[in-house]
């Protein structure tokens, strides 16, 4: 399943011209964070065992249907479902779509956490993994240069503002609910302080 999901990322990145700050390397990083959070939560929540494919696939695919990167979110979701259909059940695909279409920072800040039923912890694992990956200021710079065509110095300046206004507030905004993410975010927060 993971091989197919990463293949999907490579194909969608090319097809939709998704910049490198949200492509394969980012998907790999979010998947690694999600795997660590999953392992840390499994002992307390053994029901997660049946949701591992949902968590890992969501972590890998989370940006491939985002309206910031694709012109038609519904079409991208349909294509992703078709691409992954031989590797995941319809129920798993439904859960993945519910997670990846509601986990963005802006949606959470605006609407709070969605009701994803039995997948609540899976949702938080994937969402937190993506937030942890945001502690890389170079990704912000790359996004500014690639997508917004900013000069390096301007992209650095904007990235610094984004870090202060958003990333460095993740902890005080209470966006981490799992213990592993709380500890890792503190480590990343302290090493990323601007």
Region locations from a protein language model:
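Alpha-helix C-capping/helix-to-loop hinge sites
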Residues: 15-19, 37, 41, 64-67, ...
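An active-site-proximal "capping" alpha-helix that borders the catalytic cofactor pocket
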Residues: 30-35, 72-86
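Short helix-terminating capping/connector loops at secondary-structure junctions
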Residues: 45-51, 91-93
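His-Asp-centered metal-binding catalytic motifs of divalent-metal-dependent phosphohydrolases/nucleases
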Residues: 50-72, 76, 97-106, 130
